[in-house]
A protein has these predicted regions:
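Short beta-strand-to-loop acidic/aromatic patch adjacent to the donor-nucleotide binding site
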Residues: 128-138
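Glycosyltransferase-associated regions of secretory-pathway enzymes
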Residues: 1-120, 137-278
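Solvent-exposed aromatic/hydrophobic patches embedded in short alpha-helical segments
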Residues: 119-130
């Protein structure tokens, strides 16, 4: 316990001294050191799945009908481009109709010890073979077949270029139920929350996935063969959604990616909202 306290004190001193970017990196590295003991890299036998009938999942804690307009438009875009699939938009009250989660997770999020975003991270790991799309994702085309055909696919980051500690984001996930990476992440999260009732870092999922990605030949092989989804391009629209709308810039981004990560923390321009439904 004294060793942990000393480590925390050292981190607090470093956080006070360094700028915002360095503070973010320090927090991420300390979180990874703490999470390391929970990593679980067991690999299960691979089973075949029917990619043509993959369900699509999303989540809004208070229910789809209570989501803000931006989120409603995002859901509409998913229906427009992936309406041939079974689309399930869950809420806290409907989860039990679709999947069985350990009661501990419900208790943690209800008590406020687990943020809703991290509860959502847990949920997506229990949905077996699926495509997960965060509620803040807008589609402007169908999901490419090469992604549907993959056993595991997430949005990628360039840690050096993006000045970040992780090489993935979890707002879009394509995963088979027996994906080595999916199961390793799931078991690691289970190991962590079985012993802890606090959030070590908001980006726990990304930290864990990055740490696991090359831990075994099986994990690395699956990671290396996944289609490349460029996080910088997928997130570009978020940076301009509240500015003067440019149809030319919007069309250019749509030509580069089928999905766009937005945020409900910004007020989108009226022109932007109008074009979301086009």
């Amino acid at each position: 316990m004294n060793k942990l306290k000393n480590s925390i004190f050292k981190i607090l001193i470093e956080l006070f001294i360094f700028d915002k970017v360095k503070r973010s990196k320090i927090k991420a590295r300390w979180a990874k050191r703490y999470l390391k003991k929970y990593l679980d890299v067991q690999v299960k036998e691979q089973l075949s799945t029917d990619q043509n009938h993959l369900p699509l999942w999303s989540y809004w804690h208070q229910g789809k009908e209570n989501a803000p307009e931006l989120i409603q438009r995002c859901f509409e875009s998913v229906q427009k481009y992936e309406g041939n699939r079974k689309i399930n938009i869950l809420s806290f009250d409907t989860i039990k109709d679709y999947v069985e989660l350990p009661q501990r997770y419900y208790d943690l999020v209800s008590s406020g010890k687990m943020p809703v975003a991290l509860f959502s991270d847990i949920l997506r790991m229990y949905l077996l073979t699926h495509v997960w799309i965060d509620s803040t994702i807008m589609l402007t085309d169908k999901i490419p077949q090469e992604i549907i055909d993959s056993s595991f696919c997430v949005v990628r980051k360039d840690p050096e270029k993006d000045n970040q500690e992780n090489k993935m984001s979890c707002y879009f996930i394509r995963a088979d139920k027996n994906s080595p990476n999916l199961n390793a992440i799931k078991r690691t999260l289970e190991n962590y929350w079985a012993e802890n009732d606090f959030m070590i870092n908001y980006f726990m999922f990304e930290h864990i996935s990055t740490m696991l990605s090359d831990k075994t030949p099986e994990l690395k092989a699956e990671w290396d063969k996944m289609p490349y989804l460029d996080g910088e391009i997928c997130g570009k629209l978020q940076t301009i959604m509240d500015k003067n709308f440019s149809q030319e810039e919007f069309n250019e981004l749509k030509s580069k990616t089928f999905m766009h990560k937005l945020t409900y923390k910004k007020q989108p321009s009226k022109e932007f909202l109008d074009n979301m439904s086009v």
